[in-house]
């Protein structure tokens, strides 16, 4: 999965997919009542990027729905996965459940169109704080209450705080999550970061009793870093330059080992050689 980083304006969806992304990451900011409000990152952000592009969250969802609904004039067949980077750190811990409930309602209405031919992309809820695990339970409960528990088949999870892998496992246990787990590791492109924790996550993914299904590394803009991440065995690379990642994937060392994921590739299944 080539994951376009910080796609917060509708116009950027086409821009990143046309450069080779089959997945995008979108920032979600919340108001003080835990309503998802804007697709917005803010300052500071990655070096070389504009930090302030934004849409109202529900408006962005409507644009995203068009981009991921077959038959729509804006349809982008290659776009199969969306990571919502939930900026829940602005909330109190006891608001996490509410944030999850409100997020579920927004998606149900504006993206899934209440189960009536909505967008088809798989969704990852990426949460920065292990203490906010109730965001997941609130989300799940709401889809159930609203009569669409089947949509949870399209939803996965990530804790993005670079926490100790054992602590991440405990948070999922509390949230009642088994499966659909993506594990991120990374840092802003302005700073270097080693691959030690990525390798730990990959080892968990590949062990018989691991809880991780997929591992992605962020934010990767250089060819050398891309090669390092691929050599470590990641499933996804988040980038500001999808064309750079696509280029490296076409190198002889990688093109026999990796291919770009399509809609037919289940993002919740651990890849077995």
Swiss-Prot record:
Stored InterPro entries: PLC-like_Pdiesterase_TIM-brl
What SUPFAM superfamilies does its record include?
PLC-like phosphodiesterases
Kindly list the GO CC terms recorded for this protein.
extracellular region
GO molecular function, a single term: lyase activity
Necessary cofactors? Mg(2+)
Instruction: Kindly give the CDD domains that the UniProt entry links to this protein.
Output: GDPD_like_SMaseD_PLD
UniProt KW keywords: Cytolysis, Dermonecrotic toxin, Disulfide bond, Hemolysis, Lipid degradation, Lipid metabolism, Lyase, Magnesium, Metal-binding, Secreted, Toxin
Gene3D superfamilies membership: Phosphatidylinositol (PI) phosphodiesterase (3.20.20.190)
> Per the annotation, how and in what number is the cofactor bound?
Binds 1 Mg(2+) ion per subunit.
Location in the cell: Secreted
Enzyme class, top EC level, equals: lyase
Q: In which tissues is it expressed?
A: Expressed by the venom gland.
Which reactions does this protein catalyse?
A: an N-(acyl)-sphingosylphosphocholine = an N-(acyl)-sphingosyl-1,3-cyclic phosphate + choline; an N-(acyl)-sphingosylphosphoethanolamine = an N-(acyl)-sphingosyl-1,3-cyclic phosphate + ethanolamine; a 1-acyl-sn-glycero-3-phosphocholine = a 1-acyl-sn-glycero-2,3-cyclic phosphate + choline; a 1-acyl-sn-glycero-3-phosphoethanolamine = a 1-acyl-sn-glycero-2,3-cyclic phosphate + ethanolamine
Q: List the disulfide bonds.
A: 45-51, 47-190
Q: What is its EC number?
A: 4.6.1.-
Name the catalytic site residues: 5, 41 (nucleophile)
UniProt KW Secreted keyword: yes
Binding site residues for Mg(2+): 25, 27, 85
GO:BP terms for this protein?
killing of cells of another organism; lipid catabolic process
What protein family is recorded?
A: Belongs to the arthropod phospholipase D family. Class II subfamily.
Question: Function, please?
Answer: Dermonecrotic toxins cleave the phosphodiester linkage between the phosphate and headgroup of certain phospholipids (sphingolipid and lysolipid substrates), forming an alcohol (often choline) and a cyclic phosphate. This toxin acts on sphingomyelin (SM). It may also act on ceramide phosphoethanolamine (CPE), lysophosphatidylcholine (LPC) and lysophosphatidylethanolamine (LPE), but not on lysophosphatidylserine (LPS), and lysophosphatidylglycerol (LPG). It acts by transphosphatidylation, releasing exclusively cyclic phosphate products as second products.
Q: Please report the name of this protein according to its UniProt entry.
A: Dermonecrotic toxin LdSicTox-alphaIB3aii
Gene source species:
Loxosceles deserta (Desert recluse spider)
